């Protein structure tokens, strides 16, 4: 008899998933039975939740490792089937999570209130006992009621805004709805019940004490807004004249409606204040300067105190955080601000050769007479990094539109940035908006901006050297059209352990921190950990919901190490354009070290490629055009020609002149602007049309002479390379 054929891996996994689904459905049905109210039964159900959750995690790990190569026969729609199984496991996880939360709350309720059996036994004992025992029992009951009142308030609160449930166990409510608060927790998430009897967690910042008297007071105060006064106070206690201008009532009305206002006394003074629901007091620093404001008094709404100097400014991020549009751990992007401050953190700065302290020779560009090219220079850090994905990244609110999701990385020692700041743009799917991926599959060449494979070089001797990753989004506010960039979290991967040994080359799962790299102990989304209960199961679920970044450090082979050693000592870039950077370095070495009449000469050098190539590092789409043109040209070369280094360099210069120079000085090409989709689309259309014409006409000469092509007026800087001038510019 023939042996039974073993199931294929995906088929076997699908069978196990169906068995798990049946067990979860059975457990959910069992929890609905009347017997499930017993404590022992609840404990049994809770243990089953943990066991099933572990089994689901094992299946998820096995599913992630599966590939088409594991199948003995071709499977139709393999990726789609894997995605369906992943969705099923996620659904089962959510069901178990909801059941575990329900059981945990029932256990909490049981601790706070006596069971029916205890009440019956107490009533029987009270009937048998005498009058003195009845009095003692009444005192004990009153004591228990007072103790239970510590966590069960039974107070009514009114919702000051709309809140939509974000996770299982939250309570959705609308503005103006009356809620009965059952339990006040110190973490700011209270258990409340609405008029329909629905119970769940609500944020306390959305609630205000409700009473009919306060409602009457508020309505009367809103009717007399014209009598509201604003006073300026200084550190000396001097009081500025009250506001009496006729526009004050309109301003005060805007305050009550929006919570954000701008008070304009004169053209030169504009105070921007975010009115928070929790009351704040005026703050004075140790130097005695005025550094705060007294927030809006919710009950009286009678006075608003403002400091006069220095002008208190609260940025857009504070406004968005107060409005609930972004999580509390989001901040203005630190690395983006460094890029805007100057040129010293850009790749073109680190690409330029560096002089020795004597100013008589180059420090990182030397000539190898034996090889006839620039000399290889090893560095302390030389590695290749792959960005895999970002998971569970919180979503911003509907009031802002996300223009770009990206990761910025640089070398960091805990205090300062030690390299250029490299940016990799992420892609995402509407089905999984919290997951970012890199290096997507494309029909043509992969744009260098999306390339998740990065090289990293550094010769820094710092023992705390590591890689700083900052996840960010570029956004535009729907209401004002204001643009900005937010940090969605950061993480620091130290490259050496305490004994100075490099960390191993492997995949790292890094949990993100909130705030800025100079702030410690801040979470990206504090609401995730605030909801963590004491159970191990819920803590595991909470850890899985934390934002994280997956990266892989790859070990270098001999060829990769030789290639990287031709680059500057300190530089971060993408692997897809590394061969173009090496061409630039080799041609730079030829011009500065081999072909110069005198090494002490500082004359200007006529070389368009050296003068303009650093500009490509700030215009990735033009760099992609050069990559595409060079790949097309290289495919036509013979093997003997590819082995000839001098022939390759001269051919590369011809391709550069035909492709890059006309594009850089064309008036049809809009200026490069980060995260502007319309501009990026228009630029890529111009570039694509130009490359197509070059391919058809076998060069750019016809396009340059065409009356349709309009170019910028000629400038001598297009042809002139001044290496000392570039260094002076970078130093400034």
UniProtKB/Swiss-Prot annotation:
Phenotype for residue 203 to L: Does not affect fold stability, as assessed by circular dichroism thermal denaturation melting curves and by NMR spectroscopy. Affects interaction with PKD1
This protein's UniProt keywords: Cell junction, Cell projection, Ciliopathy, Cilium, Cilium biogenesis/degradation, Coiled coil, Cytoplasm, Cytoskeleton, Differentiation, Disease variant, Joubert syndrome, Leber congenital amaurosis, Nephronophthisis, Phosphoprotein, Senior-Loken syndrome, SH3 domain, Spermatogenesis, Tight junction
Chain intervals for the UniProt region annotation (Disordered): 103-153, 205-244
Effect of residue 342 to R: In NPHP1; patients show Cogan-type congenital ocular motor apraxia
Domain SH3, chain residue ranges per copy: 152-212
CC annotations in GO: adherens junction; bicellular tight junction; cell-cell junction; cilium; cytoplasm; cytoskeleton; cytosol; membrane
Pfam families on file: SH3_1
Subunit structure: Interacts with BCAR1, PTK2B/PYK2 and tensin. Interacts with INVS and NPHP3. Interacts with PACS1; the interaction is dependent on NPHP1 phosphorylation by CK2. Interacts with KIF7. Interacts with AHI1 and TNK2. Interacts with NPHP4 in a complex containing NPHP1, NPHP4 and RPGRIP1L. Interacts with IQCB1; the interaction likely requires additional interactors. Interacts with ANKS3. Interacts with SPATA7. Interacts with FLNA.
Other observations noted: Nephronophthisis type 1 patients deficient for NPHP1 show normal overall integrity of respiratory cilia.
Protein name per UniProt: Nephrocystin-1
């Amino acid at each position: 008899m023939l042996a039974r054929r073993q199931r294929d891996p995906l088929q076997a996994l699908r069978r196990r998933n169906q068995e798990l689904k049946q067990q979860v459905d059975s457990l959910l049905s069992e929890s609905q039975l009347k017997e499930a109210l017993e404590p022992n039964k609840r404990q049994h159900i809770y243990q089953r939740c943990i066991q099933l959750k572990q089994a689901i995690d094992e299946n998820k790990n096995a599913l992630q490792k599966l590939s088409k190569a594991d199948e003995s026969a071709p499977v139709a729609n393999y990726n789609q089937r894997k995605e369906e199984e992943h969705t099923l496991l996620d659904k089962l996880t959510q069901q178990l999570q909801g059941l575990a939360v329900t059981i945990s709350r029932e256990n909490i309720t049981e601790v706070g209130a006596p069971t029916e059996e205890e009440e019956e036994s107490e009533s029987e004992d009270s009937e048998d006992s005498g009058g003195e025992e009845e009095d003692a029992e009444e005192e004990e009951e009153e004591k228990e009621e007072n103790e239970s009142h510590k966590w069960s308030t039974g107070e009514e609160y009114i919702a000051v805004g709309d809140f939509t449930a974000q996770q299982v166990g939250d309570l959705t409510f609308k503005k103006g709805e009356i809620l009965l608060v059952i339990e006040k927790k110190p973490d700011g998430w209270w258990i409340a019940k609405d008029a329909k009897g629905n119970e769940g967690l609500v944020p306390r910042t959305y609630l205000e004490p409700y009473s009919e008297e306060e409602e009457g007071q508020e309505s009367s105060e809103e009717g007399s807004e014209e009598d509201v006064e604003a006073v300026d106070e200084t550190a000396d206690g001097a009081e500025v004249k009250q506001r009496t201008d006729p526009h004050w009532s309109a301003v005060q009305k805007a305050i009550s409606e929006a919570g954000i206002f701008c008070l304009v006394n004169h053209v030169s003074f504009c105070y921007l204040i975010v009115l928070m629901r929790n009351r704040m007091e005026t703050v004075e620093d140790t130097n005695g300067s005025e550094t705060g404001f007294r927030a809006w008094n919710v009950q009286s709404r009678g006075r608003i105190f403002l400091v006069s100097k220095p002008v208190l400014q609260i940025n857009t991020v504070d406004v968005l955080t107060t409005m609930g549009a972004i999580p509390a751990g989001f901040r203005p992007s630190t690395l983006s601000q460094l890029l805007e401050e100057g040129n010293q953190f850009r790749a073109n700065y680190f690409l330029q050769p560096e002089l020795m302290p004597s100013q008589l020779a180059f420090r990182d560009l030397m000539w190898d007479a034996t090889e006839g090219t620039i000399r290889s220079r090893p560095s302390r850090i030389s590695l290749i990094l792959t960005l895999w994905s970002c998971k569970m990244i919180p979503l911003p609110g509907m009031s802002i539109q996300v223009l770009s999701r990206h990761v910025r990385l640089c070398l960091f020692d805990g205090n300062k940035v030690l390299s250029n700041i490299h940016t990799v743009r992420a892609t995402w799917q509407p089905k999984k908006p919290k997951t970012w991926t890199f290096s997507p599959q494309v029909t043509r060449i992969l744009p260098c901006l999306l390339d998740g494979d990065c090289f990293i070089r550094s010769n820094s001797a710092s023992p705390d050297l590591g890689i700083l990753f900052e996840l960010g989004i570029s956004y535009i506010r729907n209401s004002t059209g204001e643009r900005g960039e937010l940090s969605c979290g950061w993480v620091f991967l130290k490259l050496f352990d305490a004994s100075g040994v490099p960390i191993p080359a492997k995949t790292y799962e890094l949990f993100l921190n909130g705030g800025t790299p100079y702030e410690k102990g801040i979470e990206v989304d504090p609401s995730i950990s605030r909801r963590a209960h004491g159970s191990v199961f819920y803590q595991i679920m909470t850890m899985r919901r934390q934002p994280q970044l997956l990266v892989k450090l790859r070990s270098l082979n001999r060829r990769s190490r030789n290639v990287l050693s031709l680059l500057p000592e300190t530089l971060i870039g993408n692997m897809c354009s590394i061969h173009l950077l090496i061409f630039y370095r080799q041609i730079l070495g030829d011009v500065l070290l081999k072909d110069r009449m005198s090494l002490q000469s500082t004359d200007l050098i006529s070389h368009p490629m050296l003068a303009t190539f650093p500009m490509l590092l700030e215009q990735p789409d033009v760099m992609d055009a050069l990559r595409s043109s060079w790949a097309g040209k290289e495919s036509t070369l013979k093997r003997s020609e590819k082995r000839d280094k001098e022939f390759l360099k001269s051919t590369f210069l011809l391709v550069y002149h035909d492709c890059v120079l006309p594009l850089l000085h064309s008036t049809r090409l809009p200026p490069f602007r980060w995260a502007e989709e319309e501009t990026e689309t228009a630029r890529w259309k111009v570039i694509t049309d130009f490359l197509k014409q070059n391919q058809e006409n076998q060069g750019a000469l016809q396009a340059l002479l065409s009356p349709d092509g309009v170019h910028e007026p000629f400038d001598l800087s297009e042809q002139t390379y001044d290496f000392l001038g570039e260094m002076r510019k970078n130093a400034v």
